[in-house]
UniProtKB/Swiss-Prot annotation:
It is found in: Virion; Host cytoplasmic vesicle membrane; Host cytoplasm; Host endoplasmic reticulum. It comes from Severe acute respiratory syndrome coronavirus. This is ORF9b protein. A motif (Nuclear export signal) lies at residues 46-54. The gene encoding this protein is included within the N gene (alternative ORF). Residues 9-98 form the 9b domain. Keywords: Host cytoplasm, Host cytoplasmic vesicle, Host endoplasmic reticulum, Host membrane, Host mitochondrion, Host nucleus, Host-virus interaction, Inhibition of host innate immune response by virus, Inhibition of host MAVS by virus, Inhibition of host RLR pathway by virus, Membrane, Viral immunoevasion, Virion.
Length: 98
């Protein structure tokens, strides 16, 4: 057994790379309008260190990339692949971690 693997950390705590990309499924999109095949949207994340772990939606505008955070939006998160900050779409995810 590898001694480096004795402490198992939940996957959510592995969000330590600002280039990680997440698949976001908004619950209102998945359940609204009676649609059974709502496709998840993929957003890169922006990682912020120094505060409690949280996840929220944010929209890009002309003033700030962090404007209009939607912290109350229920979402389902799945890590997918790496992305660069240049690939940020109009909507992205802001992650804060201790």
């Amino acid at each position: 057994m590898d001694p480096n693997q004795t402490n198992v950390v939940p996957p959510a705590l592995h969000l330590v790379d600002p280039q990680i990309q997440l698949t976001i499924t908004r619950m209102e999109d998945a359940m609204g309008q009676g649609q059974n095949s709502a496709d998840p949207k993929v957003y890169p994340i922006i990682l912020r260190l120094g505060s409690q772990l949280s996840l929220s939606m944010a929209r890009r505008n002309l003033d700030s990339l962090e404007a209009r955070a939607f912290q109350s939006t229920p979402i389902v998160v799945q890590m997918t692949k790496l992305a660069t900050t240049e690939e940020l779409p109009d909507e992205f995810v802001v992650v804060t971690a201790k």
